[in-house]
Amino acid sequence: GKLRIIIGNKELVYSEIKNDYELNRPKELPADFDWNSTYGLYMQGKDWLNQKMYGNAEKYLKAALEKDVYFIPALVSLSSLYYKKGMYLDACELVKRVLSLDTYHGEANYLYGLCSRAMGNLADAKDGFSVATFSPGFRTAAYEQLGELYMREENWEKAEQYALKSLEYNQMNLYAKQLLIVLYRKSNHAEKALSEIEKMTEQLPLLHWVRFEEYLLEASTAEEFSSLICNELSFETYMEMAV
């Protein structure tokens, strides 16, 4: 017979029965697929992008666009790559090409917002993030970005509104929680900030920026904050928080 071992409430299962673990997902590339087609070149570029081999990714994505200058998946991926490289103007030009065809494309609008923000075009940034909120995959991040923009303008009410909207769609969005704590501190709502900090330290006690925010509100917690940063290269932790 075949052996099956179950430990606890199926916390660990070992089985010799093939149907318990064998999957039907395709495991081989199709032999008749044209890897030199527009989509084939894009897929190769996307694969290199996932591996963070950006030089190869750029090569194949550009090759795909040589065949079709309006191939949206390649435009979006290459725009994302250029944004990561700090080539904001180039990234923005590519993503504008997408928006000229599909004005509600979620990722394209989000990238448009990021590039516009990086170049200081805040009205365009708000425009891009606002339209990106229509897409569920980018909604929580786009709301958080809008909150950051309004906090920069010291529009505390709108910043809070967008931070809370972001958390409605993803309660564990740490960027939105950080935004909420920072804006409460900067708008002199220390009690609200400390309340959010308390919730965060219960959930993630080693999230150092939370304890730093607590220190900014209560200087007496300085020793407690620094005592928990005890990794080998502790200066890197401080530098990451500063950035």
Language-model segments: which ranges?
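TPR alpha-solenoid repeat register
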Residues: 74, 108, 142, 176, ...
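Residue-level recognition of tetratricopeptide repeat
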Residues: 71, 105, 139, 173, ...
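Structural marker of alpha-solenoid helical repeat scaffolds
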Residues: 67, 100-101, 134-135, 169, ...
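Structural signature of tandem alpha-helical TPR/SEL1-like repeats
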Residues: 52-59, 84-97, 118-131, 152-165, ...
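Long, contiguous interaction/recruitment modules in multidomain scaffold/adaptor proteins
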Residues: 1-36
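Alpha-helical segment of the N-proximal tetratricopeptide repeat
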Residues: 34-67, 237-241
